[in-house]
């Protein structure tokens, strides 16, 4: 097939789209392409779609236009490049581009940039809920009356950090696994995590002479969660956190940098060298290892109903593919790793009315499907009222700014140019403090020394959300901050750094003075970030009912579960949670399958 330069293609699209009556007038990409290609240029010879992941169709896109990396070279923008994706895995062309209907830019589900994609419409997530899908009685009954489409040992629902960890762990324990994902991209919320992976008494800490222990991590986690956490689950998290770091490292992860996150007594947030975002890196490593193991990954496929026999034992799961429709998979065990519900503001607001209308830092699939599936299977929910806001979501562009920026030395100031909080306090306290300021927002202020300490910051600068100036007065004028007061505030902060003690707000770490090179400001406001409540599990990741009885063959891991974090999650504990309990769920599900 002749390879078409994408820059030429886009120029043609932009120059002709909407000019009805011309040779290339079209309402969608299929109409545009058919004037230069035949239908079988995209589709299989029989005219059918290859699968729900659209594997063949995406291969055809690449054969014509090139890989995502190649396309990115021809679509550069001053601040952002939609094709230079920060997503891990192999991002499919059809994640954004549709053929026979209007396309939607997946980036718009989180960001507020103008990507101006040809033949596109405004982003809209309008999928039926699990309850609404129950109305598809005839289709569901027909699928269940048929023979199982597949027979495996374990089905994992959700391809975030917990799901991939579970799938790999189960596979390595001898199980045959199918991993399903309802979104067109992998990674869940894990791919967006930037701060670090908390773990205690690791080799990486020892190399930096950091004294830590599982007991101290346990204490910090319980305190951060207001002692509402399930102590047994927290003990699993803290005592196995080192093993999780070792497991990821053995698979190729770089977790050599160790920083501090809010609520931690010592530096225990592990991340790549130079302070790069941990989430996308971890998910990429997990994805690569899943590919090596030939794990069956099915995109655009929703887990709909856990199927049980007359004794209440799991026998499989009903799924719905975007194109294949309903079918069921026979399996001894099902692992729910579907994440939380922070993107579902209707659900969030019912549980915490104070968060009504808040935007969220989460990926669009985090609406609570797994909770509904678990409840319908008899699983109990706990701690649902505890919902966390992340304090630093950029007002411009909707970018979540990692806590590590504060951990590495940035300060928070209000429009009056004054500090108002210990910058690395727990997220609930920092969020409340920001909302109490003028305009319900604040500014992260830092210099080039902080920027150089954390490579993730260059991404924010590149996205245009971190204006810069060579003086604090100029920066203040640019951002509407009192420049004189800001200058005095930074001078005061630098004096506290020199003294080694923050007598103003009792910030426990003062890593560096802010006096090198240029200064930067990011306006931030809290956004709904993490839902601490979820499915009740035991220390084997087994889902339990309201009587705390195990549902045989049903497991849960990650943000879909409740009990680990209590009333408030500490930064850095999410990645540790999903890897630790994902591994555990996979191992236990594989063991269970062998016995049954």
Swiss-Prot record:
UniProt binding sites for FAD:
162, 181, 189, 194-196, 303, 369, 530, 559, 574-575
**Which Enzyme Commission numbers does its entry carry?**
1.3.2.4
- Cite the binding residues for succinate: 195, 390, 402-403, 529, 569, 572
**Entry note: cofactor:** Binds 1 FAD per subunit. Binds 4 heme c groups covalently per monomer. The environments of the hemes are not identical, with redox data showing two centers of -220 mV and -320 mV.
Sites binding heme c 1 sit at 39, 42-43, 99-100
The entry's heme c 4-binding residues are: 86, 107, 110-111
Catalytic reactions of this protein:
2 Fe(III)-[cytochrome c] + succinate = fumarate + 2 Fe(II)-[cytochrome c] + 2 H(+)
Q: Which CDD domains match?
A: Cytochrom_C3
Give the chief site where it resides.
periplasm
Kindly list the positions annotated as binding heme c 2.
33, 61, 64-65
Write down a Pfam family by its short name: Cytochrom_c3_2
Any GO MF annotation of the entry:
metal ion binding
Instruction: Please verify whether the record's keywords include Flavoprotein.
Output: yes
Q: Where in the cell is it found?
A: Periplasm
Primary enzyme class: oxidoreductase
Question: What is the annotated signal peptide range for this record?
Answer: 1-25
Activity regulation (UniProt): Mesaconic acid is a competitive inhibitor of fumarate reduction.
Instruction: Give the phenotype of cells or organisms lacking this gene.
Output: Disruption of the gene abolishes the ability to grow with fumarate as terminal electron acceptor. Growth with nitrate, trimethylamine N-oxide (TMAO) and other acceptors is unaffected.
Q: Which domain of life is it from?
A: Bacteria
Query: Key word Iron present in the record?
Result: yes
Assembly, in brief, is:
Monomer.
Q: What does this protein do?
A: Flavocytochrome that catalyzes the reduction of fumarate to succinate. Is essential for fumarate respiration during anaerobic growth, acting as the terminal reductase. Receives electrons from the membrane-bound tetraheme c-type cytochrome CymA. Is essentially unidirectional, catalyzing only fumarate reduction. Cannot reduce nitrite, dimethylsulphoxide, trimethylamine-N-oxide (TMAO) or sulfite. In vitro, can use the artificial electron donor methyl viologen.
Report what the protein is called.
Fumarate reductase (cytochrome)
